[in-house]
């Protein structure tokens, strides 16, 4: 009885430890973006955009602005908690003079949309204003612009709009290649002509080779189509270059020709008689 009771106690203790471990793992699991609206009615386009930004989930971006007592640091993460991990903040502002942390936007109220070369990520549900914007909750608007040369960078605050009664926001910008639309490669006219020319040359060589071998019955180099023409091509090119490029006129053959001794007849001595003195 006693050994059996001790065994049961050990098993219960192990189950209790396992339950505590599972509970702790659930608690420390990082939160992710929760789109505005009901879970089963989320926009497929927004879900696809968040999946597109997944390579940035494990990155943290920080930027510091101002000087003196008005120096603020902004920490931003994509679909991950920034700053105090229990706050659910996606973007926080830290006052460097007193290290006070203000939540600008939370990831549990995320809205996202895009254009041809940009993505707009919005975190709502930040800490309430004290005396501005009707004491509404803060909101962070991050403009992610296309930059094909970097995965992510150049995170900077642009401005804070708090002069209105409502719909105030903090505006930020950053660069990322993930915001770029896919490049569509088009063949140029020259490339198309080159492909056509290469295809015609291949058809000419293969077709001519088969014809020479199967129909004519040629062997060896004679199987190459129009072999005599290609062998004489160099001379033809040289003649054409000589005809087109040379500016010096060609030597014109003489209009007369020499006469050989065998073509000369015997001259009569009477031809010179009139030269003798009388």
UniProtKB/Swiss-Prot annotation:
The molecular function terms of the Gene Ontology recorded here are: protein domain specific binding; retromer complex binding
Query: In the UniProt record, which residues carry a glycan?
Result: 58, 84, 95, 108, 114
Where are the stretches annotated Disordered?
256-278
Which residues are reported to carry the modification Phosphoserine? 268
Coarse class of the primary localization is membrane
Q: List keywords of the entry alphabetically.
A: Disulfide bond, Glycoprotein, Lysosome, Membrane, Phosphoprotein, Receptor, Signal, Transmembrane, Transmembrane helix, Transport
Q: Which InterPro entries match?
A: Man-6-P_rcpt (IPR028927), Man-6-P_rcpt_cation_dep (IPR000296), Man6P_isomerase_rcpt-bd_dom_sf (IPR009011), MRH_dom (IPR044865)
Q: Could you tell me which PANTHER family the record lists for this protein?
A: CATION-DEPENDENT MANNOSE-6-PHOSPHATE RECEPTOR, MANNOSE-6-PHOSPHATE RECEPTOR FAMILY MEMBER
- Additional record remark: This receptor has optimal binding in the presence of divalent cations.
**What's the protein name?**
Cation-dependent mannose-6-phosphate receptor
Species, as recorded: Rattus norvegicus (Rat)
Q: What is the lineage of its organism?
A: Eukaryota, Metazoa, Chordata, Craniata, Vertebrata
């Amino acid at each position: 009885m006693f050994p059996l009771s001790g065994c049961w106690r050990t098993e219960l203790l192990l189950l209790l430890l396992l339950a505590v471990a599972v509970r702790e793992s659930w608690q420390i699991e990082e939160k992710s973006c929760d789109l505005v609206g009901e879970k089963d009615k989320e926009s497929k386009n927004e879900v696809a955009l968040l999946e597109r930004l997944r390579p940035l989930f494990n990155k943290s971006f920080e930027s510091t602005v101002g000087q003196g007592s008005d120096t603020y640091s902004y920490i931003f993460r994509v679909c991950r908690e920034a700053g105090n991990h229990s706050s659910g903040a996606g973007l926080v502002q830290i006052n460097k003079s007193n290290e006070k942390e203000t939540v600008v936007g939370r990831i549990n109220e995320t809205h996202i949309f895009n254009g041809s070369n940009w993505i707009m990520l919005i975190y709502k549900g930040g800490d309430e204003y004290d005396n501005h914007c009707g004491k509404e909750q803060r909101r962070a608007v991050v403009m992610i612009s296309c930059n094909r040369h970097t995965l992510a960078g150049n995170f900077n605050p642009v401005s804070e709009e708090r002069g209105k009664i409502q719909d105030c926001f903090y505006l930020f910008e950053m660069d990322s290649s993930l915001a770029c639309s896919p490049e569509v490669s088009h063949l140029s006219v020259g490339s198309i002509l080159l492909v056509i020319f290469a295809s015609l040359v291949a058809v000419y060589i293969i077709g001519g080779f088969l014809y020479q071998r199967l129909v004519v019955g040629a062997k060896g180099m004679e199987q190459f189509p129009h072999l005599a023409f290609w062998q004489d091509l160099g001379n033809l090119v040289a003649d054409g270059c000589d005809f087109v490029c040379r500016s010096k006129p060609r030597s014109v053959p003489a209009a007369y020709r020499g006469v050989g001794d065998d073509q000369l007849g015997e001259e009569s001595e009477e031809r010179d008689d009139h030269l003798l003195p009388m």
